[in-house]
Amino acid sequence: MNTPRRKLVLLAGQSNMAGRGYATPEDLQPIDNVEMIRPDYKWQIAIEPVTKDRPFIGTFSEDGKKIESNDPYETIMPEAGQKVCGVGLGRTFAKYLSLATNNSVIGLIPTAVGGTPVSAWQIGGQDPWDKEKYPYDEAIILAKEAQKSGDIVAVLWHQGETDANNKTQDYTEALRTVVRNFRKDLNLSDDIPFIAGNMASFYNPEISNNIDIVDNALVTLKNEEPSFDFVDTKDLNHRGDNLHFDTPSLHILGKRYFDKYMEMTGK
């Protein structure tokens, strides 16, 4: 009997897609039929953190010590025995997608990297915080590995805080290139949804004064690129740092991305 292929969901962008919400006991419990691919290409049940840019639960260094995040907003969960990277929106999206598709197995592909500008998501683009990392190139490698056992049904994107802070010129065209490159390099048809999130309303002035750079780009691409749309985040809350969504907001956001997916696919 052939194993059904996974429905794959690519998670890309910067820290608010990677996830920085506080982990709760619920977030450390498995969800039926929701899996994730790890950087070593192995599949596992998706429990938080579903991300590539922070330690996984049970990650150890070569000397046998647990590797923990140094994020001051993260808390030590007794269930994990270590600091847990924040919660993201991917698991919530996947939970609803599985239920809506006769309990299909959903495979999350976490590629988002905190702090990355849109330039890091160009072909050959470097992570400005780690010059040995190439977020877009690494995302393509991981996604292609995942495609051996599944088919990408959606790309979920949240990114732009860094570019608002940097007052990036030509953000619209840079993001358009990202969208088109993902479709080309992963052989995604024009009907595969590419869903973004607009900028929140809680940032400090150095970001909030320039969020139109990102929000206007999303409107333009919605009107000009096939199967591109975005969800609203303006009413959601931060975790205390005026930068990252809190856990309840990320659960809400995951449902909004799912609702947008269903709207775009007519399901």
Predicted regions and their residues:
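Cell-envelope and extracellular/periplasmic
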Residues: M1-K267
